[in-house]
Swiss-Prot record:
GO terms for biological process: translation. Signal peptide: none annotated. Keywords: Ribonucleoprotein, Ribosomal protein. GO terms for cellular component: cytosolic small ribosomal subunit. InterPro entries: Ribosomal_uS2 (IPR001865), Ribosomal_uS2_bac/mit/plastid (IPR005706), Ribosomal_uS2_CS (IPR018130), Ribosomal_uS2_flav_dom_sf (IPR023591). HAMAP family: Ribosomal_uS2_B (MF_00291_B). One of its GO terms (molecular function) is structural constituent of ribosome. Belongs to the universal ribosomal protein uS2 family. Residues 260-295 are annotated as: Disordered. This is Small ribosomal subunit protein uS2. It holds the Pfam family Ribosomal_S2.
Length: 295
C-alpha cells in the first residue's frame, strides 16, 4: 500500500510556515489558527497546520487514486514556477499566471482559446505552410502563441472541470475560488493570517509568501498525488516499472470519479500533549537561535 507523505512541526518551522503577517493586517476569521504574536507579527499555530496538512494530503491522495483531476492555482511571483514544476511532476494541471475569468465557469470560451493555441502551434511548426506568411505575420503568430501558453499551458489537456482545486494565496486567487464554489469543486488552500478561510473545504494555516514554505507545500502535494497515481495504476493492473510512461495518459483520462464535496474542516481539536510540547519547544529553540545570532 502506498504511503501518504507527512510533515512534522520541526519541518514546518524550518520552512517558516509559522510566520504570518503583521498583526495590523490580520483577518479575524483566522483567529482560531493563530498561536500568538511576536514583534508585531502573528505566529501561526503549527500544531493545527500539521494536522490539517495531513487531512489535505489524504484528500489529494484519494482524489488521484480515484482517477480524479487536480488543478493547482497560484499566480503570485513566488509560487509561479514552483506550482508548474510540481504539478507537472505529478501529472496534474496548473494555472500559474493570470487567471482568466471563466476558466472554470465558462469553459467553452477557454476551450476555444486552447484550440486557437493548438492551431497556432501547428502552423508555426509547418515550414511549408509558413512560406505563405510574411516575417511580421509569423512574428505576430509567435507572440500570440506565447501569450496563450502563459495562461493555458497547464490546462490545455483539461477537458472537463477538475475534481479538486489546490490554491496558494486565497486573497489573490479569489476569482478561482468563487468559480470552484459555483461548480461544487472542493478546495484545498493554504490560508495565511490575512486570508479569508470561508469556502475553503480543507484549509492549511501557513505562510503563503515564503518560497521555502511554498516549495514544501508543493512537494508534499505532488508526493501525495503520485502515491494516489501509483494506487490507481496498481488497481488498473499497470506495470509499476512503466508508471512514468503512463503519467501523460492520466492527464487526458476522461473516466473521472467525482469527489464528493466534504464539509468544511475547521479548527482541529484535542491536539495531544506531545504535539503541544513539540511546538512550544520548537518555537523556543528558534527564539534562542535568533538571540544567539544577534548577540
Amino acid at each position: 500500500m502506498s504511503k501518504i507523505p507527512s510533515v512534522n512541526i520541526k519541518e514546518l518551522l524550518d520552512a517558516g510556515v509559522h510566520f504570518g503577517h503583521k498583526t495590523s493586517r490580520w483577518n479575524p476569521k483566522m483567529a482560531s489558527y493563530i498561536y500568538g504574536e511576536r514583534d508585531d507579527v502573528h505566529i501561526i499555530d503549527l500544531r493545527q497546520s500539521a494536522a490539517l496538512m495531513s487531512v489535505a494530503l489524504n484528500t489529494i491522495y484519494e482524489t488521484v487514486k480515484k482517477d480524479g483531476k487536480i488543478l493547482f492555482v497560484s499566480t503570485k511571483i513566488q509560487a509561479s514556477d514552483i506550482i508548474a514544476e510540481y504539478a507537472e511532476k505529478c501529472g496534474q494541471y496548473y494555472v500559474n499566471h493570470r487567471w482568466l475569468g471563466g476558466m472554470l465557469t465558462n469553459w467553452k470560451t477557454i476551450a476555444g482559446s486552447i484550440e486557437k493555441l493548438n492551431k497556432l502551434e501547428k502552423t508555426l511548426e509547418n515550414e511549408e505552410a509558413l512560406m505563405g506568411y510574411t516575417k511580421k505575420e509569423i512574428l505576430d503568430m509567435s507572440r500570440k502563441k506565447e501569450k496563450l501558453l502563459l495562461s493555458l499551458a497547464g490546462i490545455r489537456n483539461l477537458n472537463s472541470k477538475p475534481d479538486l482545486l489546490v490554491v496558494i494565496d486565497t486573497n489573490k486567487e479569489h476569482i478561482a475560488i468563487n468559480e470552484a464554489v459555483k461548480l461544487n469543486v472542493p478546495i484545498v488552500a493554504v490560508v495565511d493570517t490575512n486570508s479569508n478561510p470561508d469556502n475553503v473545504n480543507y484549509p492549511i494555516p501557513g505562510n503563503d509568501d515564503s518560497i521555502r514554505s511554498i516549495r514544501l507545500y508543493c512537494s508534499l502535494f505532488a508526493d501525495a498525488a503520485l502515491q494516489g497515481l501509483e494506487e490507481s495504476m496498481k488497481a488498473s493492473g499497470v506495470d509499476m516499472g512503466a508508471m512514468q510512461e503512463h503519467t501523460d495518459k492520466a492527464l487526458t483520462s476522461k473516466n473521472v470519479s467525482k469527489l464528493k464535496q466534504a464539509k468544511k474542516f475547521s479548527k482541529t481539536k484535542n491536539i495531544d500533549e506531545e504535539t503541544n510540547t513539540e511546538f512550544e519547544q520548537a518555537l523556543n529553540d528558534a527564539d534562542e537561535n535568533k538571540n544567539s545570532d544577534n548577540a
